[in-house]
Amino acid sequence: MKILITGGGTCEPIDSVRYITNFSTGRTAAFLADFFCAKKHEVTALMAENAQKPKNAKIITYRTFSDLQKILESECKIANYGAIIHAAAVSDYSVQEISVDGKIFPAGTISKIPSGKNIFLKMQENPKLLQKIKLWSGKQTKVVAFKLTSGATEEEQQNAVKKIFLAEKDFAPDFVVQNDKSEITATSHPCKIYKNSDKIIAETKTLQELAEALDGALWGAPIEGVGRNEVRP
């Protein structure tokens, strides 16, 4: 089966040396890519330039939101993927223009803003790529979305997942992987996998368990293991 996995974080340029980004390392996406390669799937990893890369997958890199959007649309339309795992940390906003001491410049057009200047950034909202994936690839493609919260209560986590399923409507993902930044450590990566807004099909503690659970969920196999074999209302 052909699988596309996105990972890492977008970089939105301010000038030639400054940009806005996030803390995503691409570690989860790289791990999943190598896991599915070992399962003999044909994996393409669409990764941020500075992200951790998988060892065995075909790699395509992106830098900005615009890069990711163009490449993702093209891959979805031409490559006939059976599954798309969208783990990239996509910026909600891009820099539209910069005001330097009252003078306006389009984002990314200044070589380097001198220090000591008063700078104001005008941001523009980026479209939600998750809403486009099934539109581009077809509803037959299995789509896995990721939702990271930070210091959220259980109710807040559930509401964040519910918002994804409701917002996408006819093009909703098949599964949402939810985790909370406050619970992630060097050795532990707790996740919940939702099949719809109120049904948890797996709870995992490590990336290995997450990969195995997604493998079972995507291909319809039973999900075995402690904490990963029950469907809760």
Question: Residue locations for each model-derived region?
Answer:
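A cross-family phosphate/adenosyl-ligand binding-site feature
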Residues: 1-222, 233
